[in-house]
Amino acid sequence: MFIATVIVSVMLAVALTFSAIGKLTKNPSVIPMLEQVGVPADKIPWLAYAELLGAVGLLVGLAVWPIGVAAAVGVILYFVGAVAAHLRAKDKDFAPAAGLAVFAIVALVLRVLSA
């Protein structure tokens, strides 16, 4: 079970890191979508920092399970918020955020079961 936890946590941490890099480097394929769902430009770096903290928490959480649980819960809430932002803006392109939310739920369940 712990091997599955490591695989899922590392994959999610990598996805979060790449997403954060896209925001911090103002990737032209990322920023317009964020603005379309109503994220103010000055808040975009804070979303990236939250993603990076989630990634670090998931990785540290492999050694200290309560941190992993807290990080997974935070990542779930982050992506639930992302899905809500898409729905509020009537943007139908929320599948990536929803998929990552499900992935974070899997990470949480695995971390709890392998604690």
Located regions from the model:
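Membrane-interface extramembranous regions
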Residues: 1-115
